[in-house]
UniProtKB/Swiss-Prot annotation:
Belongs to the TCP-1 chaperonin family. Pfam families: Cpn60_TCP1. Keywords: ATP-binding, Chaperone, Cytoplasm, Nucleotide-binding. This is T-complex protein 1 subunit epsilon. It is found in: Cytoplasm. It comes from the Eukaryota. Molecular chaperone; assists the folding of proteins upon ATP hydrolysis. NCBIfam families: chap_CCT_epsi (TIGR02343), thermosome_beta (NF041083). GO terms for cellular component: chaperonin-containing T-complex. Disulfide bonds: none annotated. One of its GO terms (molecular function) is ATP hydrolysis activity.
Length: 532
């Protein structure tokens, strides 16, 4: 078997016979996989924290993404060659879907745990023993997190602080207060407070290029990136009774394949009269229901458009299916699939207006229901698409952070303070164990210190010296709120700064990192491009 080689990214590979494929096994396989995780963590670690750096990524199609969001970076890197890389991407997607933030921390912590595991492997400790010891360490760390967590007192204020913590490292940090307020208000408007749950589908995020990020607004209603179908239609309907149509505004057609042969002008005239009659019947169905505005999922031709305008019925065509569903929820209306089924009870109630944005006169339709806002829209403004897309990612992360506070009312403080406190606790707890298990628990504690170490490095501090001082400071003061001064203002008390995470989010980060490490340590064979 040939020696283990690494490429420029530190990923392991072997040169083998083409027919036999590539195979790495035993401890060599574990070390190779650890190297893969380490290389990815090294790349991601500079993006951690409020002073983390951005990455610019270019796809094969030459699309450019500028971001410091860990999940987005992993997704856009398109790491498909190495199975461990794909595993990390899948775990990051799971973390992003469940918690919404903390992907970078998960990968950095997993890499630190694997570094500790590599040291133990060098001492002859079996991978399974290391995994079991890490699981014990995880259990004690979770218990300690629960002990140092605090119950929130003011829900909205805590949500605001959670949003600020999430947004502090993002592109929107200069408008931190405004974006935090927008995210908090959006969640409070549509959340089910009795069940302490939130349906993200009720928060629509739309965007328009123009102005700056500070012009981003929360609209108590639905924003549709469309305009009224005719320029002479009314631009505002204050007492809108909205017909939500999923049927096409056109004469009925045979469902089977067919052709229509017209042999003379009379037949053409008859066809024209038939179409006019059908259009008139559709208009009459709408007017009979009491509707004074139409939202249609399909398009319609100029003749139908003219008839709608002549009958004083403002209309919007090509409304997306998701938008139509949101309109139904927000206005209390029902989506109708046939004109003849349209009744007054199906109509939604709301104020509808067309707005012009920017110098290019881009238009949007705003549907507002002040009395009962069951859905909201965050309209993001920005100089270009790159800025807007990163702002939208930042908003989604902040919404998740606020949601986590809603679903779990206990918090732990950030800035690396919780990780350092857990590390100190595990050091004390490990004295009750012996042998390999004790070493694994101590290794778990040392790995947790990688988070404050990384935050200190990204903030311009001497990472090792600063981390040692923080460790000493927590031990002497017994204050587990002390963390890394990322902003350089001399304040290390995260409670005073209002920097925290939901307890559930922090626990999930620890669990995800440990699960990844356990999987890596249990893999002793990697076979790729194998041929019989």
């Amino acid at each position: 078997m040939s020696d283990l080689l690494t490429d420029e990214l530190g990923q392991a590979f072997q040169i083998t016979d083409e027919d036999k494929g590539c195979r790495i096994k035993g401890q060599q396989c574990i070390l190779a996989n650890i190297g893969v995780v380490r290389s990815i963590a090294t790349f991601l670690s500079t993006s951690l924290g409020p002073t983390g750096m951005d990455k610019i990524l270019q796809s094969k199609d030459e699309d450019i993404v500028v971001t410091n969001d860990g999940a987005t970076i992993l997704k856009e890197m398109e790491m498909t060659e190495n199975p461990i890389s794909r595993l990390i991407v899948q775990l990051s997607e799971s973390q992003d879907e469940e918690i919404g933030d903390g992907t970078t921390s998960v990968v950095v912590l997993a890499s630190a745990l694997l570094d500790q595991a590599q040291a133990l492997l060098g001492q002859g400790v079996h991978p399974i023993k290391i995994s079991e010891g890490f699981e014990v360490g995880l259990g004690h760390a979770v218990e300690h997190l629960s002990e140092i967590s605090e119950e929130i007192s003011d829900l909205k204020e805590t949500m605001m602080k959670a949003a600020k913590t999430s947004l502090g490292s993002k592109i929107v940090y200069k408008s931190l207060e405004r974006f935090a307020e927008i995210c908090t208000d959006a969640v409070l408007m549509v959340a089910d407070m009795e069940r302490k749950d939130l349906d993200f589908e009720l928060i629509n995020i739309e965007s328009k290029v123009g102005r700056d990020l500070s012009s981003t607004a929360l609209i108590k209603g639905i924003v549709i990136n469309k305009e009224f179908s005719h320029p002479q239609m009314k631009k505002e309907v204050k007492d809108g009774r909205i017909a939500l149509l999923s049927c096409p505004f056109e004469p009925p057609k045979l469902k089977t394949k067919h052709s229509l042969v017209i042999s003379n002008p009379k037949e053409y005239k008859e066809l024209e009269e038939y179409e006019k009659k059908k259009f008139a019947e559709m208009i009459e169905s709408i007017k009979r229901s009491g509707s004074n505005i139409v939202m249609c999922q399909w398009g319609f031709d100029d003749e139908a458009n003219s008839l709608l305008m002549e009958n004083g019925l403002p209309a919007v065509r090509w409304v997306g299916g998701h938008e139509l569903e949101l309109l139904a929820v927000h206005t209390g209306g029902s989506i109708v699939a046939r004109f003849e089924d349209l009744e007054e009870s199906d109509l939604g109630k709301a104020r509808v207006r067309e707005e012009s944005l920017g110098t290019e006169n881009d238009k949007i339709i705003v549907v507002e229901n002040e009395g009962c806002s069951k859905a909201v829209t965050i309209l993001v403004r920005g100089a270009n698409d790159l800025v807007i897309e990163e702002a939208k990612r930042s908003i989604r992360d902040a919404l998740c952070a606020v949601r986590n506070i809603l679903t779990n009312s206990r918090i732990v403080y950030g800035g690396g303070s919780s990780e350092m406190s857990c590390s100190l606790a595990l050091e004390r707890i490990a004295t009750g164990y012996s042998g390999e298990e004790r070493e694994a628990i101590l290794g778990f504690g040392r790995a947790l210190e990688e988070i404050p170490l990384c935050l200190a490095r990204n903030s311009g501090h001497d990472p090792i010296g600063y981390s040692s001082d923080l460790r000493k400071l927590q031990m002497e003061s017994k204050n587990f709120h002390l963390g890394v001064d990322c902003l350089g203002d001399g304040e290390q008390d995260m409670k005073k700064l209002g920097v925290f995470d939901a307890l559930s989010s922090k626990i999930r980060q620890f669990q995800m990192a440990t699960q990844l490490v356990t999987m890596v340590l249990k893999i002793d064979n990697v076979v790729s491009d194998f041929h019989d």
